[in-house]
From Swiss-Prot:
Belongs to the chorismate synthase family. Pathway: Metabolic intermediate biosynthesis; chorismate biosynthesis; chorismate from D-erythrose 4-phosphate and phosphoenolpyruvate: step 7/7. NCBIfam families: aroC (TIGR00033), PRK05382.1 (NF003793). GO terms for molecular function: chorismate synthase activity; FMN binding. Its cofactor is FMNH2. GO terms for cellular component: cytosol. FMN binds at residues 279, 294-298, 321. This is Chorismate synthase. It comes from Thermoplasma acidophilum (strain ATCC 25905 / DSM 1728 / JCM 9062 / NBRC 15155 / AMRC-C165). Its EC number is 4.2.3.5. GO terms for biological process: amino acid biosynthetic process; aromatic amino acid family biosynthetic process; chorismate biosynthetic process. This reaction introduces a second double bond into the aromatic ring system. Keywords: Amino-acid biosynthesis, Aromatic amino acid biosynthesis, FAD, Flavoprotein, FMN, Lyase, NADP. Pfam families: Chorismate_synt.
């Protein structure tokens, strides 16, 4: 439900228009000095209102850590992270109480929770709930970086604009496409879509470097299963593929297999079509996966819906502040959430000790 993880667990709480959102981390290694500036940097990458290309709901997204630290170091008790909601306008959502938005979870929440559903701003199924994912995941990401493990995500495509090259840092570009030409084209597309009152989707690629081999379990607890389980908690994510994914279905075995080789006395593979995972277990090569993020369902174009009280067809035009391309703000969410999963897997496998350190 609201808890993720095995040896290290994260529980999220709050809702889009509640007092706050947050996360509780239980099982994080003891004695780690949390780099608060680093955490806040990733919150800024995700923060709404930071660009004309994102939702204009302006939030500070400052993370408060109210437990789990002693003199700046993790002390073994649960870390509690809180992000206050300060820019809430619930009146925008009065219409969707009876008229569910097409493509949104309004209707399925009605089926499950009935009159008790939290519909304002999407409630606890809002994209706002990715803020605590970034807060918790960025701490895990900082820990992994201390081990030399790098987790990087970027926009591979937005609509029909595809970026097949990486020529810069994704966060240096407004669209998170790591190339100046692609960034400019994608920005123009988003502005055009936004002017029309519509939205557009995108694809996010992720690469994990320097992750050790031999991590993961076969069958139901494979590395792919663990990552996918977490990634699908991000609203609007509808697909994931590892390595070459669906392209493998049209390849020959002689093409899809990754031949083994030696490099500096270490076994490596010449290619990486399988994305660094075989049999659910990492092989020491970079972990690669891609996700598809659908267009934001809240758009300013009139759409047909059905009134839940009268059972009559009607039309809804969504009000409020919404992302024309929500995939852009999902990039740091994917990075941080992946980092949390990978650190949990490393703790499970014994690659990470419960103690980051016992002395300062």
């Amino acid at each position: 439900m609201f808890t993720l993880g095995s040896s290290m667990k994260m529980t999220v709480f709050g809702s889009s228009h509640g007092e706050a959102v947050g996360s509780i981390i239980d099982g994080f290694p003891i004695g780690f000095k949390i780099p608060l500036d680093y955490v806040q940097k990733y919150m800024e990458y995700r923060r709404p209102g930071s660009s004309i290309l994102t939702s204009q709901r302006k939030e500070d997204d400052e993370v408060e850590i109210i437990s789990g630290l002693h003199e700046g170091y993790t002390d073994g008790s649960p870390l509690t992270l809180i992000i206050r909601n300060k820019n809430v306008i619930s009146s925008y959502y009065s219409e969707i109480r009876e008229n569910p938005r097409p493509g949104h979870s309004d209707y399925t929440m009605f089926l499950k929770y009935g009159e008790f559903r939290n519909y304002e701003g999407g409630g606890f199924l809002s994209g706002r709930m990715t803020a605590p994912l970034v807060a918790a995941g960025s701490i895990a990401k900082a820990y992994l970086e201390g081990m030399g493990i790098k987790v990087k995500s970027y926009m591979r495509s937005i609509g029909d604009v595809e970026c097949s090259r990486v020529s810069g840092e994704a966060y240096s570009f407004e669209t998170r496409m790591p190339d100046p030409e692609c960034d400019a084209r994608a920005r123009e597309l988003i502005m055009r879509v936004m002017k029309a009152g519509d939205s557009i989707g995108g694809r996010i690629d992720t690469v994990v470097e320097n992750f050790p081999g031999g991590v993961g379990e076969p069958f139901f607890d494979s590395v792919e299963s663990s990552i996918a389980h977490a990634i699908f908690s991000i609203p609007a994510v509808k697909a994931i593929e590892f390595g070459d994914g669906f392209r493998l279905a049209s390849m020959l075995g002689s093409e899809a297999n990754d031949p083994f080789d030696l490099a500096d006395g270490k076994i490596v593979t010449k290619t990486n079509h399988n994305g660094g995972i075989l049999g659910g277990i990492t092989n020491g090569m970079p972990i690669r996966f891609s996700i598809a993020v659908k267009p934001t369902p809240s758009i300013h174009i009139p759409q047909q819906t059905v009134n839940l009280s009268t059972s009559e067809k009607t039309t809804i035009t969504v009000k409020g502040r919404h992302d024309p391309c929500v995939a852009i703000r999902a990039v740091p969410v994917v990075e941080c959430l992946t980092s949390f999963v990978l650190l949990d897997l490393l703790i499970q496998s014994g690659n990470v000790n419960r103690y980051a350190r016992k002395t300062r």
